[in-house]
Amino acid sequence: LDLAQLPTEVWPNGELPADLASRVQPLFSTDFYREKWLVAVDGSQIEIALDQGEVKAGEFAEPICELELELLSGDTRAVLKLANQLVSQTGLRQGSLSKAARGYHLAQGNPAREIKPTTILHVAAKADVEQGLEAALELALAQWQYHEELWVRGNDAAKEQVLAAISLVRHTLMLFGGIVPRKASTHLRDLLTQCEATIASAVSAVTAVYSTETAMAKLALTEWLVSKAWQPFLDAKAQGKISDSFKRFADI
């Protein structure tokens, strides 16, 4: 990074301190090659980027091999449609760690990542029921993503947390079942069942997390959240309930 190229207004006195450039050292670096494709899906323009290389910090390094999808124009549903087409092939999984997150972790000495038991659900003070539903599923997805990363990196104890996160999804769907009918999540629940069976029978973490069953189940949960897929199944009475106070719903 050439600090002299930064605009003068970023510096306290309007100019680069004389000795700053010599004192600043990078925490980590990324060195990767990017290939890009422009894809049209249902009238939307999507960029697919394939990055291959490594992220390094001191003596530590780990490989980069990832696909990124960016919607350039059009509908978000087109990105999800393309993602579904991609994960129907084995060898892909929905990751959660950015290059920067991995770089900072390496810069801290690459410590072992710890198991994180599921925390108490926290929502905004005036959240409605729908926001509570979303928060619960987002918590489950975050737990799934985090512990899947640990599991595939060699922490076998994280497998149980992955299964616990999937169970939390099921429990959430059941808890809100008085408002959101089961038929709204039939496809999602079917994919979760296939995913659980794959995880239970897999000979290794890599086999499980890079399977189409796991990838499609996790993406289905993401899509269910992003598109609010429960809404078309709500009648007028359910619409009223889901817009009501989450605190009142939880107290009951």
At which residue positions do the language-model features occur?
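Function-determining surface determinants
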Residues: 1-252
